[in-house]
Amino acid sequence: MKIKSYAKINLSLDVINRRDDGYHNLKMIMHSVNISDDIEIRMNKSKKITIATNLKYLPNNKKNHAYCAAEIFFEETKIKNPGIHINILKKIPVCAGLAGGSSDAAAVLKGLNEMFKAGLSVKKLAEIGLKIGADVPYCVH
C-alpha cells in the first residue's frame, strides 16, 4: 500500500496558558501544504515492524513516529502483527516544523486501518495519534 503524507504549517500559534504538566495549551491555525513523504506499507514474514528510510540518520526503531504508530495500532486494535515493513521516502524537510514525522505516523495509522480492515473512525485514529504526538490528530484528518 502506498500513501502520501503531507506536511503542514502553522499560520498562527498563540500560547493560551501553561498546564500543570509543563506543556502549554495552544490556539493554532494550521494548513496542509503540497510537500509530502511517500510511505509504503507491505507485509513481511518477520512478525515484527521493520522500517527503512532514504535518510540514513533517521531512526528505524521506536524513536520513529511511523514505527510508534504501527506499534500502537496493533496494541489498540488487538490485531496480531503478522509482520509489516514501512518504507519512507522523506521529502518533507526534517526538523523544519512541518510535522513530517507526525504526518508519517498519521499515514501509517490510516494505512494500517485500511490494510487490516480495522474499521476505526477518523476520531479514533486521531485519539490514537495523540499518544504519538500533538500534531498527529491534525494530520489524520
Task: Give the ranges of each region predicted by the language model.
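ATP-binding N-lobe of GHMP and related small-molecule kinases
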Residues: 1-96, 114-123
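A cytosolic small-molecule/anion-sensing beta-strand core signal
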Residues: 7, 140-141
